[in-house]
């Protein structure tokens, strides 16, 4: 005997997977639940199909920034070297809107306090000196060369970036536990 998922009465199931009795109200609730689940799946697929290139860029940037903030968790601000208390920004050394080629480059983006990133426009003079200490002058030179190249991302490339950083976030969070 099993207990019905909806009316909580005892019933004899026909199969081991059956979770509700054959009362018309319970069957109706079960059918509505199945329809709702199917609609949610269909809606999610439709939403993905309607996403534009700019939607994928925004999503890729959100996932990438989340990864940067997790990677740099506990480190001081890259620009002012003060401990980051509260909200954190993923600060781009080369502006993300003007230098598309290094927009998702991990050497170009580091955690920064809101004061430096938003109110001091990245505090770039201090950022550069600390960036040299962090990644080295050779890597910074390569980054500067890459930054001057032009690039346009395709939706498939952005999907790969999203999946790559979602996986990194998942692995990081799994290792944290």
Question: Which residue stretches match the model-derived regions?
Answer:
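A boundary/linker detector
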Residues: 1-63, 151-177
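Short, cysteine/histidine-rich loop/knuckle motifs that typically chelate Zn2+
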Residues: 6, 23-25, 78-81, 115
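Residue-level signal for mature regions of secreted extracellular proteins and peptides
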Residues: 14, 19, 70-73, 106
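Short cysteine/histidine-rich metal-coordination sites, predominantly Zn2+-binding motifs
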Residues: 20-25, 38-44, 92-100, 128-136
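Short Cys/His-centered divalent metal-binding micro-motifs
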Residues: 25-32, 85, 109-136
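Short Fe-S-cluster ligation motifs
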Residues: 48-55, 106-120, 138-160
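Short cysteine-rich loop/turn motifs with clustered Cys
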Residues: 61-89, 113
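Histidine-centered nuclease catalytic patch
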Residues: 78-109
């Amino acid at each position: 005997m099993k207990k019905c998922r909806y009316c909580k009465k005892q019933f004899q199931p026909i199969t081991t997977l059956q979770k509700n009795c054959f009362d018309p109200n319970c069957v109706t609730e079960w059918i509505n639940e199945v329809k709702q689940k199917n609609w949610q799946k269909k809606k999610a697929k439709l939403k993905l199909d309607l996403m534009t290139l700019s939607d994928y860029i925004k999503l890729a940037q959100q996932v990438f920034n989340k990864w940067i903030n997790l990677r740099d968790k506990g480190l001081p601000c890259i620009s002012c070297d003060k401990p980051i208390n509260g909200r954190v920004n993923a600060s781009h050394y080369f502006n993300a809107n003007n230098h598309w080629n290094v927009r998702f480059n991990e050497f170009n983006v580091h955690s920064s306090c809101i004061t430096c990133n938003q109110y001091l426009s990245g505090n770039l003079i201090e950022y550069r000196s600390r960036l040299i200490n962090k990644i080295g002058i050779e890597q910074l030179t390569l980054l500067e060369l890459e930054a001057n190249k032009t690039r346009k991302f395709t939706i498939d490339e952005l999907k790969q970036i999203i999946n790559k950083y979602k996986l990194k976030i998942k692995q990081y969070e799994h290792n944290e536990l």
